[in-house]
Amino acid sequence: MASSPRAFALVFFAIAAVGCTQLTTADDAAPPVWQKAHATFYGGADASGTMGGGCGYGDLYSQGYGTRNAALSTALFNDGASCGQCYKIACDRKRAPQWCKPGVTVTITATNFCPPNWDLPSDNGGWCNPPRPHFDMAQPAWEKIGIYSAGIIPVIYQRVPCIKKGGVRFTINGHDYFNLVLVTNVATTGSIKSMDIMGSNSTDWMPMVRNWGANWHSLSYLTGQTLSFRVTNMDGQTLVFKNIVPSGWKFGQTFTSKLQFK
C-alpha cells in the first residue's frame, strides 16, 4: 500500500531531525586539535638561563612569565609574531611512553626564538631546523611532562588562550626619534598583530612597525608628549589606550593600563 504524503513528510522530518541532532552533538564533542612536535629544555633548573631572549621580554620573572616559557623554532616563531602566545603541551605517550609523565600537561608562553643549527641534521641535534615544529622549553616546565634523562621527547601541543592578571603593559625604550615600545601581559591571543601611536601634539594615529619580538617602534619625535596606543591582537580585537603615558615619561619606564583583551 502506498504511503500518504503526510506520512512521508513526517518520516522525512523525523530523519532530518535525528541527523541534525547527531551532527550538532558530534560538533560539540569534537576534541581540540593537537599537533605533533618535539621538545627539549634549556636554562637550568631555575630557568635563569631563559631570561632575555628573542621576544625582548627581559626578566621573565618580573614580567610575570615565570618559568613556564619556551623558545620556538622557525616554523612556530613566525618572525616574532608568535611572541606571547600560549601553548598547552603534553608528552606523546604513543610515541615514547618510557619518557613521558602520564596524564600531565603544561601551558607555556612563547618568549624566545630557537635558531636553526645547520651544522647538525634535523633528526640529530638540529632540532629547531625548518620545517620542524619544536619547543625548547624552560627546564622546570619541561620536567612537568618529561623524564629528565630523555633530553628530548615527542610532544603534542595546541594553542590556548593566555590568562593574565591586570592590564596590558607598555615599556618605552630607545631615544629621541626612535621610540621602542615593548608590549607585555597580553591576554587571550597573547600576541599583537598591529599597533599605532599618537602623541598629544597630533590627532592622527601613526602606524608602528614590529622591530623585533614583542617590540614595536616609531621614528617620530614624541618626547614630552602624552602618548596613546591603539593595539590590535591576532584575533582582530582592537583596544585604544588613551593617554596611557603621561607627558613627563622617561625612556625605560613601564606603564600599566586598566584595559585587557577578552
Swiss-Prot record:
Residues 1-20 form the signal peptide. It holds the Pfam family Expansin_C. Keywords: Cell wall, Cell wall biogenesis/degradation, Glycoprotein, Membrane, Secreted, Signal. Residues 52-167 form the Expansin-like EG45 domain. Glycans are attached at residue 201. Belongs to the expansin family. Expansin A subfamily. This is Expansin-A14. It comes from Oryza sativa subsp. japonica.
